[in-house]
Each structure stands twice: as C-alpha cells, then as structure tokens.
C-alpha cells in the first residue's frame, strides 16, 4: 500500500511514476476525486460542528435570561441531523478510499528500465556455458515420461490438467532439490528455516498484496475465508504482521519450503505441457526484513543467494531487471533469474527476487524502532525464489540429458540422491 500522505501531497508526481508501469492506473483518478470530496466534506462537517457549538451557547444564554429558545433548538436539531448525515457519507467515502488504496500498485524505482512487456527487460549478466549437444535436445516432459519418473496422464486422471505425478527417482530428485536448497540457504547464507502453514486467512493475503486485486488467481477454501498459499512469501511475511521489531534485529532472513497453489487464471494456453506452469508446485522461498536505507543492498545479497543455487547445480542462467511494465503489483524493483532450457533454445524464469519497499509493511502494519525511544517506522520487505523446484527439475533433465535419454545427476545433488549419479 502506498503512503497515503505522499499520494495526497504529490498526486500528480505519484501518478506520473505509476504510469511508467503500463499507462493509466485503474482506480487512481477515482481515488483523487473521492479524496477531494472527503476534504470538502470534512471542512463542511467542521463548520457545522462549529455552528452547533455557537447555537448551543446562544441557547444556554437565552435560557439563563429565561427567554424563548425554541427556534434555536429547532435549528440545532437540523444542524445535528446534517452532521449525522455528513458523518455517514464521510465514513462511506473513507471505506471506499481504503479499498481503492489496496488496488493501487507500488511505485517503480527510478533505475528500473521503462518498458511495456518482458521484451523490454534489461539483461544484467550471464553465467555458465549453454550445452552444445551433438543431437536434437528433447523437452523435459518427453525425457521424464520416457524414464517413467514423471506421469502427466495419471495426474490428469486423478485431478486435471497442469498437475504432475513424480515417480521413483523423479520423486527422489524433487525431494533432493528441496533439501539441497534449504540446507544451502540455512547453513551457507544464514537464513532461519521456517515451515509455515499452507493455508492462510484473508488478512494475510491482503498483507502481501494478493488480495483484493488477484483473488481469481488463488484457490479459496469453500465456506471458509481461508486460501491455499500461492507462495510461502504470504505466511512468512505475515509472521511479523502487526509487530514492532527492534532495529538491531534487522535484517531478518527466513527461508521456507512450501507447496504452492495457483489457478493460473490469466495463463490459458501458455506452457500447457511439462513442469513450467502448474497449479501445484514446490518452491523454496527467501524472505527478508530490512532497514529502509539498506533494502536495495539486501536485494543484491538475496539475488546472489538464489544465483548460488544455480551455480552449484551447474545450470546456465542469466539475470534480468524487469522493466516497469513487467513488474509485479507489489514490487518496486525485481531481478529475474532465467535458466537455459535447451529444447526451447531460450532462457526461462526460475526465480524472481524483489524489493517491495514499505508496500507490504504498510498493508500488514510491520514496523521497527531504531532505538527504544524512537518513533516506529515501516520496515522494508523483500522476497525471492531460492528457487522454484519443479522448474529446476525441468532444467536438470534438459541440460544434463544424454543422447540415449539418460540424465546425469549434478554432482552437488548426488549426496542427496544416495549417490545415484545417472537416471536411466
């Protein structure tokens, strides 16, 4: 949520910054109109209350002098009724303003490149050599099916499209990756491991920005105001909802493994095969709470931690800065890590690392004190994938495939696979 004081004091400036995202921001003009009405109404109510006070004093004076005050009493009754009506209208306007404020996205940082789509994202760096196969590389869904480690048909029978059954060494590979990533972040990158609930309440989803704007993209539990998490960012960020942290605690860093659930309502027809876009998938999430002046530094640190996973696995990747039009709703700056996928001859997203600024902290009321006597300030929150597990499975199958269809296991994973070094 944006700082409403800044929005009111510099509306045109904020509007110009937000329009760098993708043009007109829905709800912004309505907010301005309503806020102007609110200010006018507050002034009117204050004038009416002042008038009521004056009339009350006049009535008291007349009564002291034992004079007729009936006409003034009638006038005061009318004024009181108008105040009551205006107060009700004011409450209605303020409720709508609060709802509108929840639908306005975050402001991009000044160094975020301007653009309208992913085509305008800026490449920052590359790592690793893409494999040079002497044969036509096969897509991961063909490899996994042939090895009998991925079963898309039975998953569709059990549930529907965009689900997968992992079998045998495929299931073991997924589990090995989760343990490898969690261990790496906890022991080498100094994160505190968290195992959060996979079901959260509405307040948590509002706190991190999924609701109210993106309710169609998440799964809601029928007859309960609970939601299946689309990412561990939701429960982990909300661990400190409504709290005031101590400045010396910051930065706070958590890593969490979770299964995630997304309806992918806006992705019909995209990535219908394989592991890239699933309704249910596993991911290791990184969440950081930071001092405001240190959050961009923390973004660089967190992005490096996600990169280290791909480096250790020997997977070629690149880092891109998302342009203004490709930023997510809550982000002020995002780096995407894109892993090389040989069958498509392109890089595909495997991690997004974002600085959210105080956007979530305002929604979830997460603050800190620099010292015991200082006024609480909003923290900055950051989150990133460290990394998406299913997409890592897909990348390993494709980048480590052999001509006979077997898959070499990356050396770093072999201790987690019982020293299995090849899938065949």
UniProtKB/Swiss-Prot annotation:
Pathway: Aminoacyl-tRNA biosynthesis; selenocysteinyl-tRNA(Sec) biosynthesis; L-seryl-tRNA(Sec) from L-serine and tRNA(Sec): step 1/1
Keywords on record: Aminoacyl-tRNA synthetase, ATP-binding, Cytoplasm, Ligase, Nucleotide-binding, Protein biosynthesis
Pfam families: Seryl_tRNA_N, tRNA-synt_2b
Principal cellular location given in the protein's record: cytoplasm
EC code: 6.1.1.11
GO annotation, biological process: selenocysteine biosynthetic process; seryl-tRNA aminoacylation
UniProt cross-references to InterPro entries, sorted A to Z: aa-tRNA-synt_IIb, aa-tRNA-synth_II, aa-tRNA-synth_II/BPL/LPL, Ser-tRNA-ligase_type_1, Ser-tRNA-synth_1_N, SerRS_1_N_sf, SerRS_core, tRNA-bd_arm
UniProt subcellular location: Cytoplasm
GO CC annotation terms, alphabetical: cytoplasm
Top-tier EC class: ligase
Segments for region (Disordered): 109-129
Catalytic activity: tRNA(Ser) + L-serine + ATP = L-seryl-tRNA(Ser) + AMP + diphosphate + H(+); tRNA(Sec) + L-serine + ATP = L-seryl-tRNA(Sec) + AMP + diphosphate + H(+)
Binding site for ATP: 262-264, 349-352
GO molecular function: ATP binding; catalytic activity, acting on a protein; serine-tRNA ligase activity; transferase activity
Binding site for L-serine: 231-233, 285, 385
HAMAP family in the record: Ser_tRNA_synth_type1
Function: Catalyzes the attachment of serine to tRNA(Ser). Is also able to aminoacylate tRNA(Sec) with serine, to form the misacylated tRNA L-seryl-tRNA(Sec), which will be further converted into selenocysteinyl-tRNA(Sec).
Sequence similarity: Belongs to the class-II aminoacyl-tRNA synthetase family. Type-1 seryl-tRNA synthetase subfamily.
Domain notes: Consists of two distinct domains, a catalytic core and a N-terminal extension that is involved in tRNA binding.
Binding partners and assembly: Homodimer. The tRNA molecule binds across the dimer.
This protein's name: Serine--tRNA ligase
Gene behind this protein: serS
